[in-house]
Amino acid sequence: TTRQCLLNPNRNPTLSEVQIEEAVLESLGGEKLLWVGDGLLNDHTDGHVDTIARFVHPGVVVAMEPRTADDPNREVLATLIRDLESLTDAKGRRLEVVRVPSPGRVLDDAREVMPASYVNFYIANASVVVPTYGSPFDDEAVQRIAALFPGRTTRGVNAKAVLAGGGAFHCITQQKPQAGHARQQSPAPIPGPIPGLTS
């Protein structure tokens, strides 16, 4: 998760980082929570992590890297990659970071920078839908993400209109694992709402 999101005063003003981490791990049956810094500029979600990095396999994370000098997220993404490369997963493995390009400077109709992200893709049972933005990096991003999901059809779909409302395809969908693909060991049951914790 990002510190920008879960430590934002508008979300969990009375909880410390340690308290938030304990609540998340207990609720999800997790063993380790990986923290990174900030999300994308102008992100409607206060920096949800699914706009900057995604686990694609155990120990393997896909993240965007800036390719242009005018990328509005140049510093955030460079820091993210450096941070991810220094982290280990719950099994103690150093993360493998697969880089895809950032779409760069994507503007809305009012000429404001949009929080455009290729890693906010949606994974369906037999396909992957990658958000695109009419950027010169669209095709490369779709190809690189497709290589991470052999056996699935990967398509790029323009997401500018969706993004204008907040988030792209992963943000606007609710994923449900296919039957038979659950973890070997079930996580702890999710309790009711955690007092004071919002995501």
Give the location of each predicted region:
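The feature marks the mature, well-folded catalytic cores of soluble enzymes
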Residues: 1-190, 194-197
